[in-house]
A protein has these predicted regions:
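Core catalytic alpha/beta fold that binds nucleotide/phospho-ligands
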Residues: 1-119
């Protein structure tokens, strides 16, 4: 069965996070590898945030049953985004019989969007 998920986020939502809690937020949502990829590049972080939301929609759970770090958005050999799942997200992937993922992330100056397809 083909499944899809999409999410869009305003980039300034991340930029405007209170500096006093920004590091804690980033460390709660993103893995070390994702932080290494994006650094303080807010369009990159926003794209991965949208991607995690889109993946959670494909899995039919939303964020909650699945933790943010259970969904990891890495870089493939050619720089393309790839999805790597852990813990509850991986269990849900197996339960749903998902074997293939496709993801697209894009952003403008103001928003980031991610579209995910799985089967």
């Amino acid at each position: 069965m083909l499944r899809n998920g999409v999410d869009i986020i305003e980039i300034d939502r991340l930029e405007k996070i209170n500096p006093g809690i920004r590091a804690r937020f980033i460390n709660r949502v993103y893995t070390e590898s994702e932080i290494e990829i994006c650094g303080n590049n807010y369009p990159c972080l926003a794209g991965r945030f949208a991607a995690k939301e889109a993946v959670s929609k494909v899995l039919g759970t939303g964020i909650g049953e699945i933790r943010w770090k259970d969904i990891e958005i890495l870089r493939g050999e050619e720089g393309q985004p790839i999805i790597k799942l852990h813990a509850n997200a991986k269990l849900k992937e197996i339960e749903l019989g998902i074997h293939h993922w496709a993801i697209s992330i894009s952003h403008s100056r103001t928003v980031a969007i991610a579209f995910v397809i799985a089967h």
